[in-house]
Swiss-Prot record:
Annotated positions binding Ca(2+) 2: 114, 116, 118, 120, 125
Record GO biological process: brain development; spinal cord motor neuron differentiation
Binding site for Ca(2+) 5: 250, 252, 254, 256, 261
Organism per entry: Danio rerio
Gene Ontology molecular function: any one: calcium ion binding
This protein's UniProt keywords: Calcium, Cytoplasm, Metal-binding, Repeat
Gene that encodes it: scgn
Source superkingdom: Eukaryota
Binding site for Ca(2+) 3: 158, 160, 162, 164, 169
Principal localisation: cytoplasm
Protein name as it appears in the record: Secretagogin
Top-level taxonomy: Eukaryota, Metazoa, Chordata, Craniata, Vertebrata
Residues annotated for Ca(2+) 1 binding in this entry: 21, 23, 25, 27, 32
Residues of the EF-hand domain: 8-43, 53-89, 101-136, 145-180, 193-228, 237-272
Sequence positions that bind Ca(2+) 4: 206, 208, 210, 217
Localization: Cytoplasm
Amino acid sequence: MDSAFANLDAAGFLQIWQHFDADDNGYIEGKELDDFFRHMLKKLQPKDKITDERVQQIKKSFMSAYDATFDGRLQIEELANMILPQEENFLLIFRREAPLDNSVEFMKIWRKYDADSSGYISAAELKNFLKDLFLQHKKKIPPNKLDEYTDAMMKIFDKNKDGRLDLNDLARILALQENFLLQFKMDASSQVERKRDFEKIFAHYDVSRTGALEGPEVDGFVKDMMELVRPSISGGDLDKFRECLLTHCDMNKDGKIQKSELALCLGLKHKP
């Protein structure tokens, strides 16, 4: 393996690949190959001078090893197999086949399978979890491929070998989008800016467009809020903070957080 790729992880590799494989057909072709390898080298060695000779050297090495059909193009799986460690490679392939939209969608699925709020999902539950996830994205996965994904996940992420995965494990596996709340800096904003940001935030989590956060919408908001101050949270932590949020914000005790209630909790005056 070339030293240029020693520190590359799946997230970084995927971001670069998607930039060049614009039509998402699983190939990088022609001049794109030169641009692709040049970009990767610049990303990984920002202080080094990237010469045409170095680019062609890397390109030749990859093409001779993986372009078995001599058609002048490479597949993402071939590159991943060569330059990524096993764990990151698996994450890469999985992310391409089943991207999740946001934390609300993730929590809808989590709540369906963690029905007892234990904070864990067993191997059997995981298999059903994946099946529904692929159906949600209108993808038909053969039984053998479903078994392969399930087994691989348990082997990689079930570190203590107790046959179950926690909330944080699945959040990483399913590659949730970057925390939506990271783009906002409420403390440093004026009242006008805070109100504007609040509208964006509420609209993002109010997926059902009912004017209130309920069920997985509350879960998704709580998850992102907690992760602003605590990068790794458990299912139990989420449930405790969710209960706390409802206690303080759900003024009419209907199990939902109305837009006006959340605004009040955040120190904003909301006009219906």
